[in-house]
């Protein structure tokens, strides 16, 4: 995603509050408090992801029920779709008989997503680990098979990652991914989340993920970034701010939502350092700024929680919050 036009944001999203602060050498320095509210230009340092942690499942291709991705036997405990010929009795004479699935069973999984009109991504891949699906399987997108030759090894968060270029298989509007798996043992099935991976933004509409153009301006002061709810990695935010002089100062970022990530602050392209924990303060040396407008860049590296679990830690309520649930409630 490209950057927005230079100076498009001005300094409307920043509020500078000067205060006296002592640095480590005991010298008094002017503290510049930078509000993270408002719109900043944003530039993700890697491709975005759309996470699928829930699918619909069926054993007959007709009756469907929503489940979390997990092993087949765990999904059986979550649903009521197994019965009749899918259940077998086993046990020796004189011992209690046990119910078990009558393997092999053909199981179908499907999930839908939309692509906003006129916003088909220039890069779009299906991404998953090699062990995400256990059991012989076939994957179709809009009724067209994702051929084995399309899969290539990639390294996103694990050496087992693989991705298939699916741009030719999708269309504007509604799309459907269907996975057929031959279940032969309890631990088979669609066991882990899988993803769309590419140059897009992610929205939510009527309980469905929607791929959009990547936002060029976002508000960093949020539990998760609009358009990038499942993004894990480094995100760069940039704006301009007016400084009164080129004197040394201490920079502090002001948040409505506390941030406890690894953060780097750059002024006019020069790094003031990286903070991975509180206090989040950066020493801006004399000469790094100039009187007037200066370019301020904030690089934030978050954890894999957004991508792997679809959650973030709510420090105000001290709990793990589900991103999709919160987005759908907005």
Name each region found by the language model.
Residues 1-4, 261:
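Carbohydrate-binding surface patches
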Residues 4-101, 130-133, 151-240, 250, ...:
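An acidic-aromatic loop/edge-strand motif
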Residues 92-105, 109-116:
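Regulatory/sensor and coupling segments of signal-transduction and defense proteins
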């Amino acid at each position: 995603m490209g950057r927005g036009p230079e100076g498009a944001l001005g300094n409307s999203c920043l509020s500078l509050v000067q205060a006296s602060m002592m640095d480590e050498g005991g010298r008094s320095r002017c503290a510049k408090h930078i509000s993270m509210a408002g719109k900043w230009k944003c530039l993700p340092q890697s491709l975005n992801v759309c996470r699928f942690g829930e699918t619909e499942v069926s054993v007959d291709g007709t009756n469907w029920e929503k489940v979390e991705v997990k092993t087949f036997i765990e999904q059986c405990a979550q649903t009521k779709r197994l019965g009749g010929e899918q259940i077998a009795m086993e046990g020796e004479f004189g011992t209690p008989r046990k119910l078990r699935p009558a393997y092999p069973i053909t199981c179908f999984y499907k999930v839908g997503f939309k692509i906003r009109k006129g916003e088909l991504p220039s890069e779009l891949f299906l991404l998953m680990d090699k062990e995400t699906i256990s059991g012989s399987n076939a994957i179709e997108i809009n009724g067209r098979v994702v051929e084995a030759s399309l899969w290539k090894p990639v390294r996103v968060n694990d050496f087992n990652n693989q991705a298939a270029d699916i741009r030719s298989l999708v269309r504007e509007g509604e799309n459907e991914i269907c996975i057929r798996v031959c279940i032969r043992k309890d631990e088979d099935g669609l066991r882990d989340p899988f993803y769309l991976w590419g140059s897009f933004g992610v929205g939510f509409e009527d309980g469905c993920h929607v791929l959009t153009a990547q936002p060029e301006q976002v508000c960093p002061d949020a539990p998760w970034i609009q358009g990038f709810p499942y993004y894990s990695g480094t995100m760069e935010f940039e704006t301009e701010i007016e400084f009164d002089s080129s004197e040394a100062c201490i920079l502090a970022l002001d948040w409505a939502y506390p941030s406890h990530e690894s953060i780097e602050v750059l002024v006019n392209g020069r790094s003031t350092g990286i903070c991975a924990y509180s206090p989040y303060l950066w020493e801006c040396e004399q000469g790094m700024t100039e009187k007037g407008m200066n370019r301020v860049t904030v690089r934030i590296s978050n954890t894999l929680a957004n991508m792997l679990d679809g959650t973030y830690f709510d420090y105000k309520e001290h709990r793990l919050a589900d991103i999709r649930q919160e987005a759908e409630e907005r």
